[in-house]
């Protein structure tokens, strides 16, 4: 019998003006404790953590094991080859903008890689992940670790056909081919050691599809230039020591998605308008985490005070929240054998 553990960090994407570009991993981990027998038998899945009452334990329906089966079928393996026990421990909030679905997809690909001894590198595994989760900013951060920028390359017409089925269709399809190679490219960006992330997590879910639906289909040049100018500076500003909080605060502003999503998150506009490095010493910048509703604040100190100021504003708008103070997970996703 083999025993191993897969750990996949949470992530925050759309950092500041970096919509669909910038992401960071966070030291809050989805963990899979796996036992693989040398004999054939069923795969048994158990789960504890956020959303337990809503998470399917059916291997054919759970996102982690569905993704594993997708990878196995791409490699001509129809099902889990050995009796497998998987216990998932997941503190990452579901549907809150902390990359829970991306972490699940990564965990599923890594699980298949270990069980079938496919020998895939992290970048090779990312090709499968990106077939399921097609926004690289959060999954690249979770897989590779740290603060990253990323993009999907342009595909040939043949590759577009392979990429065209939806993730749901891929997960249900029995006849599958290998994904296009080198789908995503990333670069690790500098990160000042004194910076930490305060994640304020509202007690309500916001589906990414709903958050996407409020965005415009096209943007004016002024708003695009506004974001591009700040994005260029942010990728350097977060790595400077000492941190310039007023610079970071300004270059974390956004006009591409936050103004449109603010109506879905009561209190967000007030937080963005009233909290700054002058009112909250130690605060460097604030933005939505992913599509929300979680709000991310970067700070060098006074973490609890900043968090409580944000919680107070949310409370005035009738929104209950909790918060975490987290560092980037620089190792990304890992596997450990026992």
Swiss-Prot record:
Q: Which cysteine-cysteine pairs are annotated as disulfide bonds in the entry? A: none
- Pathway of this protein? Amino-acid biosynthesis; L-threonine biosynthesis; L-threonine from L-aspartate: step 4/5
Q: Which reaction does it catalyse?
A: L-homoserine + ATP = O-phospho-L-homoserine + ADP + H(+)
The biological process GO terms on file are: methionine metabolic process; threonine biosynthetic process
Return the broad EC class. transferase
Family note:
Belongs to the GHMP kinase family. Homoserine kinase subfamily.
**GO MF terms, alphabetically ordered:** ATP binding; homoserine kinase activity
Q: Which Gene3D superfamilies match?
A: 3.30.230.10, GHMP kinase, C-terminal domain
Q: Which Pfam families match?
A: GHMP_kinases_C, GHMP_kinases_N
InterPro entries per UniProt = GHMP_kinase_C_dom (IPR013750), GHMP_kinase_C_sf (IPR036554), GHMP_kinase_N_dom (IPR006204), GHMP_knse_ATP-bd_CS (IPR006203), Homoserine_kinase (IPR000870), Ribosomal_Su5_D2-typ_SF (IPR020568), Ribsml_uS5_D2-typ_fold_subgr (IPR014721)
Listed GO CC annotations: cytoplasm
Q: What is this protein called?
A: Homoserine kinase
**Function of the molecule:** Commits homoserine to the threonine biosynthesis pathway by catalyzing its O-phosphorylation.
Q: Which gene encodes it?
A: thr1
Q: What is its EC number?
A: 2.7.1.39
Report which superkingdom the organism of origin falls in: Eukaryota
Keyword annotations from UniProtKB, A to Z:
Amino-acid biosynthesis, ATP-binding, Kinase, Nucleotide-binding, Threonine biosynthesis, Transferase
- Identify the HAMAP family for this entry: Homoser_kinase
